[in-house]
């Protein structure tokens, strides 16, 4: 398990970043909410990570706080939501907005995320 990556931010792309740590450049998928608040390239960052291992793929997903990482992991526990779907939800809704929508039962707000229909939004709330 890789709990976090700390190093120099060397690249930003549409849905991922690269952090140079030691002698490695580590690619990490991140939601838009993270991309929007990252420091400029060349600055140090600390990204809390979730390592997703599949038969043919290993991917890191990253967040600025442990609580946002935990929200991502809770979304992974919802039937029908994989890591890319969870990342899409957290890109469409800031983690605090998603928490509020879940607490108030606002399925309409959750279903605004791409690929999330009414049934999936209800499963997230439950």
Label the model's feature ranges.
Residues 1, 71-77, 86-89, 101, ...:
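Residue-level recognition of specific faces of alpha-helices
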Residues 1-77:
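Structure-specific DNA junction-binding interface
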Residues 51, 58-63, 83-102, 123-126:
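Amphipathic, charged-and-aliphatic alpha-helical interface segments
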Residues 111-114, 124:
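Glycine- and Gly-Pro-enriched alpha-helical subdomains that act as flexible
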């Amino acid at each position: 398990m890789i709990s976090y990556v700390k190093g120099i931010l060397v690249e930003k792309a549409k849905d991922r970043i690269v952090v140079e740590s030691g002698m490695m450049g580590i690619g990490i998928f991140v939601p838009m909410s993270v991309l929007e608040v990252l420091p400029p390239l060349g600055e140090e960052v600390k990204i809390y990570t979730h390592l997703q291992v599949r038969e043919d793929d290993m991917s890191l997903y990253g967040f600025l706080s442990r609580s946002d990482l935990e929200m991502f992991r809770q979304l992974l526990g919802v039937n029908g939501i994989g890591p890319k779907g969870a990342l899409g939800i957290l890109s469409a809704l800031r983690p605090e907005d998603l928490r509020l929508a879940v607490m108030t039962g606002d399925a309409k707000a959750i279903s605004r995320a791409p690929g999330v229909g009414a049934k999936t939004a209800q499963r997230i709330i439950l």
